[in-house]
From Swiss-Prot:
Extracellular side: 34-42, 87-101
SMART domains according to UniProt: SH3 (SM00326)
Record Pfam families: SH3_9 (PF14604)
Coiled coil ranges: none
Family: Belongs to the SHO1 family.
Localization in the cell: Cell membrane
Name of the protein in its database record: High osmolarity signaling protein SHO1
PROSITE patterns for the chain: SH3
PANTHER family xref list: FCH AND DOUBLE SH3 DOMAINS PROTEIN, HIGH OSMOLARITY SIGNALING PROTEIN SHO1
A GO molecular function held by the record: actin filament binding
Residue span, SH3 domain: 327-388
Keywords from the UniProt entry: Cell membrane, Membrane, SH3 domain, Stress response, Transmembrane, Transmembrane helix
Membrane spanning residue stretches: 13-33, 43-63, 66-86, 102-122
Length: 388
């Protein structure tokens, strides 16, 4: 967050209040300097000195464009200054008839008004009517919501725009994913295109060779370095550049980053069945009754029948029918009722106090199975693990 005067000059509220504060402080310090010290309250010197420090701090924060990060701190600091200036005003007016003291009292009154305005602004919510009215005059258009320098925000936006799928702190290729709500990642705004899905599930991600199921391949051993995320077939690239071993930007994914939102099934994406995301050996989408899958042993495209059942959510499976190989080791009780997102075929609905079987409880979304056999994912903050 670089220091720039343009950050300060583009905010009329910052210019007006800081300029007003400096003028009021000059009036106060001039009156204090011209008054007779035997009749001047000595503690007021500390109040005047403290006030100029607060004004300079606010100026620096505006110039660095990180005023929002210290709003609550400023409320406390300015509140102390407000006590100092009001107390000095009382002592200077009623305990002395000196012209210098009265001049200093006038400056302290102006500083008290300024401090009160700062307390109301910095202590108010950004969406409050007063704050929105003040921020509407900002030349930046968004008030102080955009923190940091322009290049910093530009890079952050580019990183978020390159997020292909899924959730949480994963690094795929050279795009860094910031932690955020998985439900937001699954919304229509951030849905990946078919091209990004093809690149994400192809044999290579970033600069490192991958299997079709996401496991990293060692170019020397031609074997996965870690357990396969799902599916039974691996596709090893034939042309691998060994210089990639020394590249720090090799993409990777770990099991903690998989929350079930990675499950997609597309006839254009090899190995993209539910088996590639949830570790389902049969490579099937658990939300519709179809025996075909994109993550089969051949790694070929999904059958055309799968596309006809994409939005079916109410198919129920028994243990013998699913063939998922998932062991549900825990039981959880639903704290609230939850209606599945119709845009996400992997979610399941449940009602309050319903008992669910769950597994893979590390992320925000857990694999779950209802009592009727329906399998999918559920939000972890809607359920509570039971002692078994």
């Amino acid at each position: 967050m670089g220091f720039s005067l343009s950050n300060f000059t583009s905010d009329p509220f910052a210019i007006s209040t800081v300029s007003f504060g400096i003028m009021a402080w000059v009036v106060a310090i001039a009156g204090a300097a011209s008054s007779k010290q035997e009749n001047f309250p000595h503690f007021s010197w500390w109040g005047i000195s403290y006030q100029i420090v607060i004004i300079l701090i606010i100026f620096v924060l505006y110039a660095n464009n990180n005023i929002e990060l210290y709003k609550f701190t400023l409320v406390g600091l300015v509140s102390i200054a407000f006590i100092y200036t009001t107390n000095s005003t009382n002592n200077l007016i009623y305990n002395s008839n000196s012209a210098g003291n009265l001049c200093c009292a006038a400056g302290c009154i102006l500083l008290s008004i300024l401090n009160l305005i700062w307390i109301l602004y910095f202590g108010g919510h950004p969406e409050s009517p007063t704050n929105q009215f003040i921020d509407s005059f900002s030349l930046r258009g968004q008030g102080h919501e955009q923190l940091g320098s322009g290049s910093h925000n530009h890079n952050a936006n580019n990183a978020n725009n390159n997020i292909p799928i899924g959730a949480g702190n994963a690094i795929i290729g050279k795009g860094e994913m910031s932690p955020y709500d998985d439900r937001f990642a699954a919304s229509g705004v951030n849905q990946p295109t078919s091209e990004s899905l093809r690149l994400a599930s192809g044999p290579q991600m970033g600069n490192g060779p991958f299997t079709t199921t996401g496991a990293i391949i060692n170019p020397n051993l031609q074997q996965p370095l870690s357990g396969s995320i799902g599916g039974s077939a691996h596709h090893t690239p034939t042309n691998i550049n060994n210089n990639n071993n020394n590249n720090n930007n090799t993409g990777y994914m770990t099991s903690s980053h998989l929350t079930g939102l990675e499950n997609f099934s597309s006839p254009h994406v090899p190995g993209s069945g539910a088996g590639a995301g949830l570790g389902v050996g049969a490579g099937r989408d658990l939300t519709h009754n179809s025996n075909g899958g994109g993550g089969g042993s051949g790694g070929g495209p999904a059958s055309a029948n799968n596309s006809n059942n994409t939005n079916k959510r109410n198919t129920i499976y028994t243990d013998s029918e699913t063939g998922t190989g998932i062991t549900f080791r825990y039981k959880a009780k639903a704290l609230y009722s939850y209606d599945a997102n119709p845009d996400d075929i992997n979610e399941i609905s449940f009602v309050k106090d319903e008992i669910l079987e769950v597994d893979d409880i590390d992320g925000k979304w857990w694999q779950a199975r209802r009592a009727n056999g329906q399998v999918g994912i559920c939000p972890s903050n809607y359920v509570k693990l039971l002692d078994t």
